[in-house]
Amino acid sequence: MAFSAPTFSLANLLNGSYGVDTPEEVERVRSEQREEAAAACRNYRPLPAVDVSESVTEDAHSLRTPDGAPSEEVSVEFVTYGAEDYLEKSDDELSVAFETMVKPMRIGQLWCPAFNKCSFISSIAMARALLLAPRTSHRTMKGFEDLVAAIYTKSDFYYDEECEADDIQIDVSSRDVPGYSFEPWSRTSGFEPPPICEACDMIMYQCPCFDFNALKKSCAERTFADDYVIEGLDGVVDNATLLSNLGPFLVPVKCQYEKCPTPTVAIPPSLNRATDRVDINLVQSICDSTLPTHSNYDDSFHQVFVESADYSIDLDHVRLRQSDLIAKIPDSGHMIPVLSTGSGHKRVGTTKEVLTAIKKRNADVPELGDSVNLSRLSKAVAERFFISYINGNSLASSNFVNVVSNFHDYMEKWKSSGLSYDDLPDLHAENLQFYDHMIKSDVKPVVSDTLNIDRPVPATITYHKKGITSQFSPLFTALFERFQRCLRERIILPVGKISSLEMAGFDVKNKHCLEIDLSKFDKSQGEFHLMIQEHILNGLGCPAPITKWWCDFHRFSYIRDRRAGVGMPISFQRRTGDAFTYFGNTIVTMAEFAWCYDTDQFEKLLFSGDDSLGFSVLPPVGDPSKFTTLFNMEAKVMEPAVPYICSKFLLSDEFGNTFSVPDPLREVQRLGTKKIPYSDNDEFLFAHFMSFVDRLKFLDRMTQSCIDQLSLFFELKYRKSGAEAALMLGAFKKYTANFQSYKELYYSDRRQCELINSFSCVELRIERSSSTKQRKKKDGIERRRSDKRRTPTGSYGGGEKTETKVSHEESTGTRSQKSQREGAFKSQIVPLPTILSGGWSGTDRAPPCEHGGIIRI
């Protein structure tokens, strides 16, 4: 029976069986070592006391130095104890000994190599064995660089007895394992020779080709991470590297693992580095070059133009009610962005705006499909769905769970909105065919260069009230969780508690991608899609009466926007805000994809709503025309295809793990959003900052390899410079560092007004003369009929003294009219200053502090 070659470990090396530990096996070997060390500690029996120090240090100077090693004396002061003695030491003592003997390199709070008790004690035992090997064996041991290479190549530690050591000069590089390099190394004084210019052969500091002062200034902000790509240390620093760092008693040999090939051409340093400090002007220049039509986009009055201009639209069966429109509630203002990224203002749901959105999102349903037998074909599509995606054994063994708990969670979530158990309606008494309608006030960022000719239309939401949704949502949530548990391993739905876009052990590089873009997805769905959903829901275990009930009030419905006074009937198409929207869109996309492509040819398949992405080793084969001719969808196969789904790029790190990165083009547009409400304590701005930080938590995983992937995918998808994407990452890194940096992106006119007034330490005092108007006295406080504010009474110069808090939002004309109605001032009137862009307005355009008194604003 053939046994596999033993892997390299210190234990196997001591007992004579040794092998190679590849980077992919490091984690497995280390776990085995930890288990062996734990077992050794449990079964440890102290050995008889032996004076090890005399046996080691007696002839320490007579030990032979391996060939090719430096001639410095080898110190053995740290190996006077055996491995058994180190087992009795505490972790703190071992940590101090590790730092003294190995001298690890510190990277922040990390050590390279990292401290491991088992590996450290085993290394000491091996070092002691290597020191005694020349005395215990008559054979000639190889030089240490050859010795380390022999460990990796599974060759002998000693030279052949028939040949002398001098006769065998083995080229170590010819026996290297790919990715490893072994070369003699000796400690130096730390002096580094000055760089030499390739152009004129002079020292770079004296070379006229380089401006040393500018170079010094550009490199002032450099850190360790700017020049060295810090990868995960686990798996890179192995036992052989740890042994080579035990310098006091081993011949120094540089043994390192190189993940990336060393560049053959040395590139002279550039004066403009990517690590230069990021400022607001750099970010704006990136926006101007990447989004040329966005930088000058200003839609402040676009909706005013729409409301005041002539309007013509062609819709059938529309009901308009103009008598009970809900007036717009004025807000407290919004923060103003410093960047101009093409972000629009909030949309108000007026009648014209709603009609425009309905025309684009709900009306003009395309008729692209052929005539088919709906009953027979819907069953066939549903059957193909289960064969392609569902694990039958898991579906048979799983059941509904957490339906009631999901209901209570939903009620608790919306408790603050006034939803209670007593207000739940009787669904049999409700007309479920009536849906409320609204438009989204936030418009999705536009990545195409069309803002100069096309005004984005807001998306619409068609929804039931919370009392109705609360009774359907728990059922579909539990059904979706069961659906996820029954999916095959290669199918990923990036939503919920048990799935995400993080894929461990899967590399997106060297794969063929397939991305299908489905346009007009919601309104293109018809009776065929509804029948497919009904068969799939019944197959997943949803009660048949509920499935039929749900599908019945989706066949013909009526939507109404109470605020805009617009209503119209619709049929079949997706309701964008009910309890089944995401789940229904996902299974429709999966069913259509399984009918057009053989899913067995893909290694991974990702679905989320109307988005889909597939990875295959060979170019995918299928018939995408069926999306149009059979399923009535406007489908487009994205070419060139890149790993992109849910507005995120998928990248792979050096360890073969895949993670998601939000689209930099969309994120840089969000930095200029105009939808952050103003607040005195910046609570809304801080909430946007925390959301921004959560979306960009991937930045800590971005190595140079990942940045190169992102630049390539960005360039392929948008036909724009990939270097701009790398610069955007630098901006994201700055503005996620702290909230103070993020606040540089926004300002407020109100905040500027308060900032100016904060330098004034005066208070405006207004004295009113006695008036003939009737007053009321209550609790000793005079109150004018026309003035609802209560003001304390007092005497000042024979008159009544009041302190009036004046809002800066009042206009000067309004204030003067009120003053005339209230009466003439007995004392000198101090004009209330008005803050303009050019300075102060009022008497002599002087700040209020020059008039004296007290002003409160």
UniProtKB/Swiss-Prot annotation:
Residues 772-857 are annotated as: Disordered. GO terms for molecular function: nucleotide binding; RNA binding; RNA-directed RNA polymerase activity. It comes from the Viruses. Residues 800-812 have a biased composition (Basic and acidic residues). It catalyses: RNA(n) + a ribonucleoside 5'-triphosphate = RNA(n+1) + diphosphate. The keyword Nucleotidyltransferase applies. Residues 511-624 form the RdRp catalytic domain. GO terms for biological process: DNA-templated transcription; positive stranded viral RNA replication. Its EC number is 2.7.7.48. Interacts with replication protein 1a. This is RNA-directed RNA polymerase 2a. It comes from Cucumber mosaic virus (strain NT9).
